[in-house]
Amino acid sequence: MAPSVMEPVAAFDVPTKAAPNLVAPEPEHCPGPESEQAGKGDACAGCPNQAICASAPKGPDPDIPIITERLSQIRHKILVLSGKGGVGKSTFSSLLAHAFASNPESTVGLCDTDICGPSIPKMMGVESETIHVSNAGWSPVWVTDNLSVMSIQFMLPNRDDAIIWRGPKKNGMIKQFLKDVDWGDLDYLIVDTPPGTSDEHLSVNSLLKESGVDGAVIVTTPQEVSLLDVRKEIDFCRKAGIRILGLVENMRGFVCPGCSNTSEIFRATTGGGKRLAKKMGIPFLGSVPLDPRVGMACDYGESFVDNFPDSPASKAIKQVVRSVGEMLGEDPNTVLPPDENDMVE
């Protein structure tokens, strides 16, 4: 029987540490209510929560060793982040997964941790699938022979059902994706996250840190309103100890489906992603133009990279994949062998 969010099986009884019930918001320099210094540090002096934090349970999550063992067969773990919704982060995650998997020598997993807005199954063409449970754990849904997906969407009795959960329950679900899913031997695990810096990001980072998360790819668009939030995302990564693999500028230019020429729609009013990456001291992985056929491919659950290899967007995505591979210490041309379509015009 497949697990369901409406009729949870035993696997949903996720053991989580009880968070302290704070009487006031955490101050700016708070070490964290679950940290070893909670209630003891200099920043705690005078805080209304000091006594509560000092008496709260401390120590590492007991499930982290289990997660580390489960993910030990995965060579590279990549987070995909964005500061703002609507920049194409989930679309980019699906394109990244398809591009990595276009190399038949690579095995790729895509984990959808956007609990309240799971769109990955639709984009990958497996929306109607369900999860199977065996002695080895939950089996991810296989899109192709070398590309698998896990999402809460597979557990919904009806695809339009809303997920209305508070932070601890969402964190418990993410923990199950990492602890109970039988990913097997993977070359790459791509973790698509919700926008912003929320509970899900903290949960994924804390659970993956011991198992060696390689880093994060941050997605933005050229406009300053997106870059404003990306600066916060970069600051979050640095404070959380997440290595930034690089910044990707999405929707930079529009590809005409008739003539394949590229024109600017969302102009970079303050220099765009490339200038921001240079200013913030992080790698710039490349710009991906907006091609209407990307949306069409996602709606039909097909691989845009495979269906439209001559599109400037496909060529740009492949270059980003090679850049990510290089940041991971791999040979870019081994990660994705070049072909005659890959020269970006």
Curated annotation (Swiss-Prot):
It comes from the Eukaryota. Its cofactor is [4Fe-4S] cluster. Its main location: cytoplasm. One of its GO terms (biological process) is iron-sulfur cluster assembly. Pfam families: ParA. Component of the cytosolic iron-sulfur (Fe/S) protein assembly (CIA) machinery. Required for maturation of extramitochondrial Fe-S proteins. The nbp35-cfd1 heterotetramer forms a Fe-S scaffold complex, mediating the de novo assembly of an Fe-S cluster and its transfer to target apoproteins. Belongs to the Mrp/NBP35 ATP-binding proteins family. NUBP1/NBP35 subfamily. This is Cytosolic Fe-S cluster assembly factor nbp35.
